[in-house]
Structures are given as C-alpha cells and as structure tokens.
Amino acid sequence: MEQTFFIIKPDGVKRGLVGEVLKRIEQRGFTIEKLEFRSQVSEELIDQHYQDLVGQSFYPPIREFMTSGPVLVGVISGPKVIETWRTMMGATRPEEALPGTIRGDFAKAAGENEVIQNVVHGSDSEESAKREIALWF
C-alpha cells in the first residue's frame, strides 16, 4: 500500500483546522498510519526537510514560519495516496487553489514579503515520501 507524509503547518494548527484536515483524510478512505503533534520544530529539522530550498533568498521566512508554532505530522496510506492527497491539498498558491481543496478553502494569500500560509504539506513523490517519513519518524 502506498504511503505519503503530511504536515499540518503552524497556521493550520493555530486556526483550529486539525480536525477538518483529519476528517477529510478519513472521509477519503485513507488510513492514518502515524500521527504526532510537535509543539516545537527545530530549524535543523526544517532545513533537512526543505533541503532543496536552503540557500535560496526566499527560504529564511519559510524556516521562520515553519518553526513559529506547533505542527501535526503524519503518515497516511491508501491507493494512489500521494497523487490523491496532493489533489486534496490544492495548488500551493492560495489564489490558484480550487474551492473544495484544503488550500482553496482555508489558505491565506501572502502579502508582499510574507510567507504563503497554505495550511498543509504533502510529499510530492514516492521518493520524497520515503525520505520525509524517515526524517520525521
């Protein structure tokens, strides 16, 4: 069975969206394999998670945002879970996310010099899922 990794980001936790996101996962028929609340995430872990972005000029605000508050991390499984979860999340940019997706319904567009607050993260490939699951768990 295919697995993927997800994060409910600090904005999702702060805004009380954990239950809504988990409900959507369960309603889709996916199995929640692992779930862990992290009250604080280190900069080192975020740097490892976003290793391809470290060094980019836009990265420091992402690191600051991802370490700004608690997150919920998890592993879900099911048929075509990576592709389906990414569809359920919606486009990264809130203004491009369709209504009915998590980001379309709940994400907030970023103002100038602000980080997009798009509620959730999901692995973009099987390789990324394996790497992220091993990193966080």
From Swiss-Prot:
Compartments where found: Cytoplasm
EC assignment: 2.7.4.6
Group of enzyme by EC: transferase
Positions annotated as active site in the UniProt record: H121
SMART domains named in the record: NDK (SM00562)
Binding positions (ATP): K9, F58, R86, T92, R103, N113
Primary location: cytoplasm
One BP annotation, GO: UTP biosynthetic process
Reported function: Major role in the synthesis of nucleoside triphosphates other than ATP. The ATP gamma phosphate is transferred to the NDP beta phosphate via a ping-pong mechanism, using a phosphorylated active-site intermediate.
Quaternary structure note: Homotetramer.
Name of protein: Nucleoside diphosphate kinase
